[in-house]
Amino acid sequence: MAHSQVGIQLISESTEKTLAELTALCAEHNIIHHEKSPLALVQTDERLELRKLDEPKLGAVYVDFVGGTMAHRRKFGGGRGEAVAKAVGIKGSELPTVIDATAGLGRDAFVLASIGCQVRLVERHPVVFLLLQDGLNRAYQDEEIGEMLQQNLCLLNVHHINELDPNSDYADVVYLDPMYPHKQKSALVKKEMRVFQHLVGADLDADELLLPALQLAKKRVVVKRPDYAEFLCGKQPHFSRETKNHRFDIYMGASQC
């Protein structure tokens, strides 16, 4: 399913990659330059990043699996004890295959890949897709984690899981984390998330993900929700795992019912 055309400012600050190259890459994904957009996709020498030009203090959004919070989470996080690991059913030597159908910036998927799961990513928004692709390509070159990520984490060239064939593209687990409107006042929402939400908005068609997810999942579908959100599709899960601010609603696949 092709995403409708996205207009955003395209800027190159790179000495190696020209604006023409960035524009051509974006055109392949139905992204066009729109000079009045407050959002900009910027190519620097280091990476591709998203900025909100009218709120520069919010900083840039980019995908970084190698340093920063992801490095800390990989080295000092809970690993198998993390809530997402328990929710997808990691236990003992059991490492389920996973399709993350709302990949976003890839953080939960990275945690699962670091533990040893093979994770395939699907991202519906073309700008986020390019940010994710850029972050993955950089991480694949890393001496410490590059080889592991090449084996365990890949971005599929589709923009919706309904493009996948349940007969050949199935996985043990399908993971869904659709964007949900924040209850807090915007000042309390993390800066990065404010930029991200301005681009993506709330997932108004999130309910359309559950049925194809159930068709693709051999064992379970896991839906991450804010603790105050209703069930996806209004459908009662088989059980839920609750954390401080979220819950994971778990729907067992047909083979597990």
Curated annotation (Swiss-Prot):
Its EC number is 2.1.1.242. SUPFAM superfamilies: S-adenosyl-L-methionine-dependent methyltransferases. GO terms for cellular component: cytoplasm. Pfam families: SAM_MT. S-adenosyl-L-methionine binds at residues 107-108, 123-124, 177. It is found in: Cytoplasm. Coiled coil: none annotated. It catalyses: guanosine(1516) in 16S rRNA + S-adenosyl-L-methionine = N(2)-methylguanosine(1516) in 16S rRNA + S-adenosyl-L-homocysteine + H(+). Keywords: Cytoplasm, Methyltransferase, rRNA processing, S-adenosyl-L-methionine, Transferase. The keyword rRNA processing applies. Belongs to the methyltransferase superfamily. RsmJ family. This is Ribosomal RNA small subunit methyltransferase J. It comes from Haemophilus influenzae (strain PittEE).
